[in-house]
Amino acid sequence: MIEASKLTTEFGSLVFNDKIMKERLPKDIYKAVHKTIEKEPHLEPGCSYSCSSNHEGVGNREQCYHFTPPGSSPMTGLTAEKHDSFISPTEDGRSSWSSQEKSWLRANLMHQASQWWSSCHNSSMRGYQHGILHHHAFIKDGSLLLPTAFCSYGGEALDRDSLLRSMEALSNEAVKMMRLLGYEDVNRVNTTIGSEQEYFLIDKDFYKKRKDLLLTGRTLIGAPASKGQEMEDHYFGVIKPKVSAYMHDLDEELWKLGIPAKTKHNEVAPSQHELAPVFETANIAVDHNQLTMEVMKKVADKHNYACLLHEKPFEGVNGSGKHNNWSICTDTGINLLDPGKNPGENIPFLVFLMSVIAAVDEYAPILRLSVASAGNDHRLGGNEAPPAIISIFVGDELAEVLKAVEAGEAYKAAGKSQMTWEQQYFTFTKDNTDRNRTSPFAFTGNKFESDGGHSSVANGKYGPQHMQLQKEVATLNAKLSAYSGDELKEKVKEVLKETLLAHKRVLFNGNGYTDEWVEEAAKRGLPNLKALPDCMPYWISDESIDLFTRHGIFTKEEIYSRYEILLENYSKSIHIESLTMQEMIRKDLTEGLVAYEKDLSKEIVQKKSLLDGDCCALELGVLKSLDKSSAEMGKALSKLFEDTKKAEGMTEALETASYYESTVLADMDELRKYADEAEALIPEKYLSYPTYGEMLFSLR
């Protein structure tokens, strides 16, 4: 346990951070590193050697025998590592602690990049991991993890390269806008992200007995427990002692890695919890979230828990998401999404707000795709997560500001209201907007919050969002660049009004869960893309390809490869679920069902031989219900088997994914209905796997 007095010194103690670099690197090297981070694309060879030598020294001093890239996240969305030893043999048969400069900054050759690239490409393709300086090296499990980006042999981006490129492109255009508006001291604009990570904890022994959780991350069968989340007593409730101990250890491990974990609490569903960090620059936040999820699972294992990060591990209760708080900030400290005291006169705020509105409206299908997956599609559109229809909530105050913009009038602020209630001890003002949990993209004071994010993968898909915003800012720049002074002020008002009129259909402050909104959205022409296959044609549209290739974020080949990979991953996920479900029904559930029916039948026969009249009414009723469910289950199982076989023979990616979504998933839902009916009647002692009641309500 970290003592409170040592917390500040322990924070980042496993990181080769700026403080350490300043202490250990020669002054000229340290300055060169910072220059590279801020402006230059490459580090000089001599500087790279010095950095590598210092990394070697860190590894030696901290007894790290291996080094590896820090969990690069290739196209599967999963962590990838390749560990190499610092040890090198010498001519006299001994070994030396060797600097590995080429393995970090000059390129680390990886075998089989095609495993992450696409099965449609050359299977012998190799890949490289090249060093980057925007991230710090750190120590994990006895290895020194060195910051890299992963690319294929041909230079195609496979992980964070596209995010870094998009951030650079957005910054360039945003800086141009800020200087046009008179902010000459702005040299860089970054996006920031704070990701609220939801997760479930269950007993590890229960987890090991569930094939579906082990193989797919979610339960494929399971009758609901007698109690769910209807009492609303878990959200922000008192954290149970053993869970609190887990959270405490998790905080300490994250703090040592320099991850600013801040908030922890119980979530809505039983056994569901949340961890939230302080916001960071987008690329750092994405990497830290990837690392956080890995650490969460490892710490859970030490506490005899299993940490479930799937978006919908349990039917009938809320699933998990990643609530991403996203903003735009200058290097001079200006939050461009902060309305300030007078939002109607805050021109930078209005310009970037309008750019966001235009980007969300124009590229809604791509935003929907960024949160689409086989797991997350179970959650979106239900009364627990934002709908699949992309809209923006701006709150009451900003709605009035936008009305003034549209009318060409000055906005008159109503003033902040005071919070008052009986026995009030302090006076404070209300926020300028409430939170709307039914909106997929909600303004929350000085940022946008997106509740639709995946809980199981990091936020690496922010690259497209950055480019959508970059395109809209560039459009405004083109319209305004010829003006200055008072003419510029008037032209800004004109352009803002023009942009708002073109895109205001995407604004919606109401309840996104209602059928009325679905009807209204259709009238407005907003797309309702219910699953990943519905989104994919938009990804390879001419408009999308032009957006990403124009600034080198993706090549056309990279776009099409992602198209194939996303569809392939979607189909494979559902295919594995189908096979796992069939196995659990045939072996695990059927075994318990038959054993119980056999014992129940014997009991009925024995009682009828001893008793007169209408005895065994209860037992007969249960037996008949089991027999009926069993018969329907058999039919549904056969249909799922046949339809899965048909899907296995399909070759076209979109057609296959669409078939899995429309047919195989529907078969699984039908089969589950009868399986859950049967399970609800079978005593727990007959089942070889734990029930919902055991898993969700056993933590202490």
Curated annotation (Swiss-Prot):
The GO annotation for biological process reads: glutamine biosynthetic process
Kindly report, in one word, the top-level EC class recorded for this enzyme.
ligase
User: What catalytic reaction does the record list?
Assistant: L-glutamate + NH4(+) + ATP = L-glutamine + ADP + phosphate + H(+)
- Chain sites annotated for binding Mg(2+) 1: 196, 323, 472
The answer to whether the entry has keyword Lyase is no
- List each copy of the GS catalytic domain by range: 159-589
Q: Which compartment or compartments is the protein found in? A: Cytoplasm
> What keywords appear on the UniProt entry?
ATP-binding, Cytoplasm, Ligase, Magnesium, Metal-binding, Nucleotide-binding
Q: Name one GO cellular component term.
A: cytoplasm
The residue ranges of the GS beta-grasp domain are 65-155
Under Pfam families, the record lists: Gln-synt_C, Gln-synt_C-ter, GSIII_N
Disulphide bond pairs: none
Q: What PROSITE patterns does this protein's entry cite?
A: GLNA_ATP (PS00181), GS_BETA_GRASP (PS51986), GS_CATALYTIC (PS51987)
Tell me the protein family, please. Answer: Belongs to the glutamine synthetase family.
Q: What does this protein do?
A: Catalyzes the ATP-dependent biosynthesis of glutamine from glutamate and ammonia.
Q: What is this protein called?
A: Glutamine synthetase
What is the organism field in this record?
Answer: Butyrivibrio fibrisolvens
